[in-house]
Structures are given as C-alpha cells and as structure tokens.
Amino acid sequence: IGKNKYYMSKKSYARIENKTTTVSGHKYWFGKTGKVITSKWKYKNGSRRYYFDKKGRMLTNTSKKIGKYVYFFNKNGVLQRNLISYKGYNWVLSHPLKIGVNRTKNTITIYAAGSDGKYNIPVKAMICTVGSASRPTDKGTFSTGYIYRWKDLGGRTEYQDNGDVVYGQYVTHFYGAMYFHSVCYTVNGNNHTLLTGAYNWLGNSGSHGCVRLKCSDAKIIYNLAARQRCKVVVYDSNYAGPFGKPKLKKIPSWQNYDPTDTNA
C-alpha cells in the first residue's frame, strides 16, 4: 500500500501485526498497524537487540555500520556485545584498541579501530567504579602499561577504613597511581577475601582514583594489555555508550568471592 509493506497470513489471510515473520528467507518486523518496520532497533526481554535494515530485513550473520558504529550480529540476528567471545582475542587484538572510561556513567567501553583508523567497533562494555569526587580518576588520554596478576593497592577503602592494605587481581597500570583492577581483597592471593560491599557498589563512583571492575572484566583488560599497548581515554558523558551500561547482579553480604572469578 503506497510505500508501506504489509504481509497477509497464508492460513487466515489476516494482516500480520506486532510480530516478526519470515518471508522469502528473511525475517521482517511488522508493527502494531501491520506496517513493516525499517532502519530500526528492536529490543527483546530487555537485553537482546536486533536491527532491521532499510528494506525491513533483520540483519543476520553479518556486520554493519549503523550511525557512528560498526555492529556484529550472529546467525539469529542477535547483536553481539562481547566480540572477545564472539570473534576471539586474536581477532580483537589484530586491531588497535581504545578503552573508554566514562566517569559520569561508571562504564567502560572497549573499542577496536576499523580500516579507517577510527575507533568505531564496540567490543565490550563493562560496569566499573571510578574515583570519588574527592579523589577522582583523572580525565585525559593515556595508555596501558605494566600488568600485575596480584598487586598491593595500599590501605583504606570506603569498606575497610582501618588502614590495612588491600589487594587487587588482574591489575593494569594506565597513569600515575591509577590502575584497572578487580574489586579489592583483604589478603594477597586469596580470592575468597573479597570486599563484598565494594563489589555491590560497582556502577557508582567511590574509589581512590583507580578503576574497579568485576574480576572477569579486569582479566580481559589485563589480557589485552599483555599483548597490546591500548589507548585509554577517561572522559565525562551522559551517554553510556553504544552498548549501554551493563547491569550488575549483586551478591549477598556473606559471599566473599567474585562470582565472575573462574578460579574462585
């Protein structure tokens, strides 16, 4: 009808409305009025994302530049928000990498540079804790440096103020006394001494300048920095990034280990 596309059920001859349907090998999304939706994202269950191109076809098993960024979709059309697991470390490391630290949103997004040299391929988003207002994580452009499997991070945190030393796993230096690292532990090398309150505070500001992460995310940065000097950009923005801000599943107060730590 005009420029709008509709589809009639072969069984009932009724117009398909408010659902996705496969037509001639392609999936299309028909809106509430039955009109095919074009050039638009579709969200499902609050997490899965799909994209329908200008012809209304769901993107599957491909990559495509949409707006500023290049996105990857699997065979089922689901947007891939972890290219390390989808494409592998070697593929990711074949590109120059940038770690964007958004202080406003307490969110990190890792980007890979495309053939044009622009960091426009989002690789993974991570929830984090940046420095507090009194001891902020410095803004600016830096790069990853030394890495440490475990490291003494000094004394005092907002969850342990007796001055005792705390420690971090998968520690990556990027500027001055600032590091990416796991949430803190009270015993060096013992991953069952986690400061649970600090873990549950991820997504909010409050560190002494370092950037705290879930163990699995700190490990990713550690592994990348072991093989490439990654660019680090610390900035402020109300835009969480192309993958948004990841949600944190909090742990009970008695749990003394990071649930993302495969060695715990």
State where each predicted segment sits.
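Exported/periplasmic cell-wall-interacting domains
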Residues: 151-264
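Extracellular adhesion/carbohydrate-binding repeat motifs centered on closely spaced tryptophans
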Residues: 1-95, 163-164
